[in-house]
A protein has these predicted regions:
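Glycine-rich beta-strand-to-loop/alpha-helix junction loops that act as flexible
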Residues: 71-75
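FAD-binding subdomain of flavoenzyme oxidoreductases
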Residues: 99-247
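Residue-level marker for well-ordered alpha-helical positions
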Residues: 2, 52-55, 62, 119, ...
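N-terminal flexible segment immediately upstream of the FAD-binding catalytic core
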Residues: 1-59, 76-108, 137
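Feature of Fe-S/electron-transfer and energy-metabolism proteins
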Residues: 22-32, 40, 46-52, 60-63, ...
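Residue-level detector of anion-binding/catalytic polar loops
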Residues: 66-67, 131
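Short coil/turn segments at beta-strand junctions that form active-site/ligand-binding loops
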Residues: 64-66, 88
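Short N-terminal amphipathic alpha-helices
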Residues: 21, 68-70
Length: 247
């Protein structure tokens, strides 16, 4: 294992490979779930800065038969982003991959890396006059990669759909360490298998999402908030249908 750790340090730099070898290093932020109900133990927390480093780390883990736990903001409540307690798994944290690569105002898309905080993406496009409608309670700490990995819904899911409906393309590192460049902004793409939708919601089991091309919308001219009390579930459904027709 020490050879693998040295290899990780060569790829990402010593400062970005955290282990229990140093007693002063606290890995609990990566090893403990958000509710503090589960605690794992990692062989190492590896923090690559770009897709090439992710690819090299994955190749090194594949060659050494080391399991990988991809991790974004670690805000999930289902204990799906922390290692087990074996001390043999690598937590691959994408937090350093937090750049917004481009904003296409003609195609209404933004390309952002997986480690971008959701609120960071929202603010960036709002300043340019657009809306990225994915919104949820953890938006100040969850990452775009985690949203894609779990196919998050959020508070505007009824109108705009899950994260899957907001994504046009992905950049992914496969289990072999190959890089799939699928950051197409096409609204219609019939070329081959729909790997994008297969990968979204797979929680890192089929590949590691490193960047995504996401849909944007014009900012609404005005917003009104109403509190509506309804007598039954059927009435709530009818009200929703009426809102779709009139708003």
């Amino acid at each position: 294992m020490s050879d693998s750790l040295d290899h990780f340090r060569q790829i990402c730099g010593t400062a970005h490979v955290l282990t229990h070898e140093d007693p002063s290093t606290d890995l609990s932020a990566w090893e403990r779930d958000w509710r503090k109900r589960a605690q794992g133990r990692a062989l190492a927390v590896v923090r690559p800065a770009n897709v090439q480093e992710v690819s090299e780390v994955v190749k090194a883990c594949a060659n050494a038969k080391i399991s990988i736990v991809p991790q974004g903001g670690n805000t999930g409540l289902a204990v799906g982003s922390i290692p087990d307690d074996s001390g043999q798994q690598v937590v691959l944290s994408l937090q350093r991959m937090n750049k917004i690569r481009s904003l296409d105002t003609a195609n209404l898309t933004v390309i952002a890396e997986a480690g971008c905080i959701l609120q960071q993406v929202q603010t960036h496009v709002e300043e340019a006059g657009y809306l990225f409608p994915l919104s949820l309670a953890a938006e100040g700490s969850c990452t775009l990669g985690g949203n894609l990995g779990t196919n998050a819904g959020g508070t505007q899911v009824v109108r705009f759909g899950n994260t899957r409906e907001l994504c046009l393309g992905l950049e992914v590192v496969t289990a072999q360490g190959d890089i799939w460049h699928g950051l197409s902004g096409l609204r219609k793409d019939n070329t081959g298998y729909d790997l994008r939708n297969l990968l979204i919601g797979s929680e890192g089991t089929l590949g590691i999402i490193t960047a995504a091309c996401m849909k944007l919308y014009p900012q609404p001219a005005a917003q009104l908030t109403a509190w509506a009390a309804v007598p039954s579930m059927e009435a709530a459904v009818s009200l929703l249908g009426l809102a779709h027709e009139r708003l």
